[in-house]
């Protein structure tokens, strides 16, 4: 069985964060997206950037602006990041991102806030190691087909028309 050789350092480089930045982003959708919760015209999210030694990694928080679908919101995530997780992270010197969940365990819940910061650290780690993020996470490569979510449509005919449009646009999963 062929096993890929990985370049290994003689000792892991300690990672100590020097900067954390959280940005609020609002991206307009190509068309309104309607669900039983209402109609969305843009997607709001938080983008977390972490830097160390001139390298930056980014993580996205997928919470919404309201708590109607998920318990965490952009505002609660911002609060937990600013007042708890970022101060914890600044006090750490870690050899690998796998150490973060244990460090964050004292903060109960708030998994989206933790995931956004942890993913940013994972990307920073991958960039420092000079490997794609999927490899740093243990992935094997290859392609993954993307899909599209259509949302509610006024009629079955309108729904079928949208499905046909998306399939024609190249989506294999609708």
Briefly describe each language-model feature range.
Residues 45-47, 56-58, 114, 143-145, ...:
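A common structural microfeature
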Residues 6-69:
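Structured beta-strand/loop patches that form or line metal/cofactor-binding pockets in enzymes
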């Amino acid at each position: 069985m062929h096993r890929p050789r990985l370049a290994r350092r003689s000792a892991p480089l300690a990672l100590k964060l020097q900067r954390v930045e959280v940005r609020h982003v609002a991206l307009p959708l190509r068309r309104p997206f309607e669900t039983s919760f209402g109609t969305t015209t843009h997607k709001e999210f938080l983008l977390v950037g972490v830097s160390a030694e001139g390298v930056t990694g980014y993580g996205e928080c997928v919470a919404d602006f309201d708590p109607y679908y998920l318990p965490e919101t952009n505002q609660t995530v911002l609060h937990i990041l600013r007042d708890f997780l970022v101060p914890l992270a600044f006090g750490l010197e870690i050899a690998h991102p796998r150490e973060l969940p244990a460090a964050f365990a004292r903060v109960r819940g708030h998994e989206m806030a933790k995931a956004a910061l942890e993913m940013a650290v994972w990307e920073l780690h991958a960039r420092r190691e000079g490997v794609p993020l999927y490899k740093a996470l243990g992935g094997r490569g290859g392609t993954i087909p993307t899909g599209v979510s259509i949302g509610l449509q006024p009629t079955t005919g309108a729904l079928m028309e949208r499905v046909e449009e998306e399939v024609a646009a190249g989506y294999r999963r609708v």
